[in-house]
Structures are given as structure tokens and as C-alpha cells.
């Protein structure tokens, strides 16, 4: 597989895609993106750059269609492009973007789809619009789909790592703690990831919930992730 490392080359492909779109329509644009980017080895940062550039000239009312077709290819890079474009739509279309992200996550049916889209859409929404996003995440926690529940932990990891305020980090910890009885391995990894990150960056939150964490009802896998996070906090402080 050809590897692409140049932003200049990405710009050239995008310019070709734009010209094809203007002259022949959306289908021609999608062919250029598929052949020029998705079938090549392109880093996630370069794909995010491409998504930002595309969002500048693809009209808002056509963007969802373009994302749907790209994601339908099931190429890993398509989820980065779609995730980034949905992220850019969050200020105006927060709920719609989260709903579409969840549809991509369920349809993708792979852990990496959950993590790629979850971080870029739900995680960024939590970081930038916590008061609006947290109620949506609480609602998603009731879903039966394992990927939707997993993405709550993924979103928490992303937002806390990016400096989500302690107030909202604590709210998210309570939500993760309520999911600590999970038995599915994919859910456990996502929820545990979020809990571990909170423990690393906000050990005081963990101490406030120590009694609940130590209850028999709280599974050992959850407590183990907390311990790992606290140990990483100690290591970071010692450096």
C-alpha cells in the first residue's frame, strides 16, 4: 500500500476532488477521495487535515451524504474523515452529529471504529459542550449495543486527557461507576479506559468515591483500572 506523508500531496488530491465535484458531481468527488486517500496509507493527522479542508467547500447540506458514502466503504480512513467532519459540525448540529456518529459506530461494528469516531465526536463534544453532552451520554448508557456503551468510556478518556474540568470529570466518573458491572470485554475496555484516565488526572475524585469503588458489586476489572490510573499519577508526580 502506497504511503502518503505530504500535506502538499493531500492538497493536490483535494484540489482534484474539488474540480471533479464541480464538473461531474458528488460521485466523482467520492471516487477521487476513495482512490487518492482511502486506498493509501495516510496518517490520521493528515486525514483530519483533509476533512477540515473538505468541509470548507462541501456545502453543509451535502456533507452528511458525502460522509455516509465514505463510511460505507468500511475503509479505516473513512471513519477519521467522517469523525472530523462531524466534529466540525458540533457547534451547530450537536445532537445530530452525535446521533450520526453513533450510527457509524454501530454500523462499523469494530473496536477501532468506536474509538476513532467516539474520540473525535462524542469525546470532543464532551470536552467543548459538557453541559449539553453529558445528558446525551447518560441516555446512551442505557443502550444495549456494546459499542455505544463502550464509547462513553472512550469519550471520557479523550475529554479528561484534553483537560475536561474536574466538575464534569466527576460527573462522568459517576456514570462510569454505574457501568462497572459490565461483563462484555469491549465495554469493559472502554469504560475502564475512561476510569483509568480520571484516576490518573484526578485522584481526588477517586478518593471521594472510594467506598463505592470498594463495594462487592463493583467488579474487580474496574478497580484494577483505577489502581493503574492512580499508579500512573504517582509516576507522573515523581518525574
What are these regions (language model features)?
Residues 1-239:
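Surface-facing alpha-helical segments and adjacent helix-coil boundary elements at the starts of domains
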Amino acid at each position: 500500500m502506497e504511503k502518503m506523508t505530504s500535506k502538499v500531496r493531500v492538497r493536490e488530491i483535494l484540489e482534484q476532488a474539488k474540480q471533479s465535484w464541480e464538473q461531474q458531481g458528488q460521485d466523482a468527488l467520492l471516487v477521487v477521495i476513495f482512490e487518492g486517500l482511502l486506498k493509501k496509507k495516510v496518517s490520521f493527522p493528515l486525514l483530519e487535515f483533509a476533512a477540515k479542508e473538505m468541509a470548507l467547500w462541501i456545502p453543509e447540506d451535502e456533507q452528511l451524504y458525502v460522509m455516509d458514502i465514505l463510511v460505507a466503504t468500511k475503509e479505516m480512513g473513512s471513519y477519521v474523515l467522517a469523525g472530523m467532519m462531524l466534529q466540525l459540525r458540533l457547534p451547530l448540529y450537536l445532537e445530530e452529529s452525535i446521533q450520526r456518529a453513533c450510527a457509524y459506530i454501530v454500523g462499523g461494528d469494530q473496536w477501532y471504529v468506536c474509538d476513532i469516531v467516539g474520540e473525535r465526536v462524542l469525546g470532543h463534544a464532551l470536552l467543548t459542550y459538557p453541559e449539553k453532552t453529558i445528558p446525551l451520554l447518560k441516555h446512551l448508557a442505557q443502550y444495549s449495543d456494546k459499542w455505544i456503551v463502550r464509547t462513553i468510556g472512550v469519550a471520557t478518556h479523550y475529554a479528561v486527557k484534553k483537560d475536561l474540568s474536574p466538575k464534569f470529570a466527576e460527573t462522568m466518573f459517576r456514570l462510569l461507576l454505574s457501568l462497572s458491572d459490565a461483563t462484555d470485554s469491549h465495554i469493559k475496555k472502554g469504560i475502564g479506559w475512561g476510569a483509568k484516565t480520571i484516576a490518573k488526572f484526578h485522584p481526588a475524585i477517586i478518593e471521594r468515591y472510594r467506598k463505592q469503588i470498594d463495594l462487592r458489586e463493583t467488579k474487580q476489572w474496574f478497580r484494577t483500572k483505577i489502581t493503574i490510573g492512580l499508579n500512573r499519577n504517582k509516576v507522573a508526580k515523581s518525574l
